[in-house]
């Protein structure tokens, strides 16, 4: 796992992950309760951009009262 953040707020959860793909590249996933958005990334610069965007999303959620879940 290259990047992972889990957040919760009032019974809702959000998880942001970036991991190595099974055969090639990387997979970025955004879990929002039961909805999942997935992107395949084939360029390391896009991975870096996805990490930065996920960090910003996580910070915005925390500003709105979401708490990071650490396991």
List each model region and its residues.
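Intrinsically disordered, low-complexity regions enriched in Ser/Pro/Gly/Gln/His and often acidic
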Residues: 18-20, 37, 57-59
């Amino acid at each position: 796992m290259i990047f992972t953040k889990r957040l919760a707020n009032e019974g809702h959860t959000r998880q942001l992950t970036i991991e190595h793909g099974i055969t090639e590249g990387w997979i970025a996933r955004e879990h929002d309760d039961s909805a999942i958005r997935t992107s395949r990334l084939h360029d390391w610069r896009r991975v870096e951009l996805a990490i930065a965007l996920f960090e910003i999303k996580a910070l915005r959620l925390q500003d709105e009262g979401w708490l990071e879940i650490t396991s």
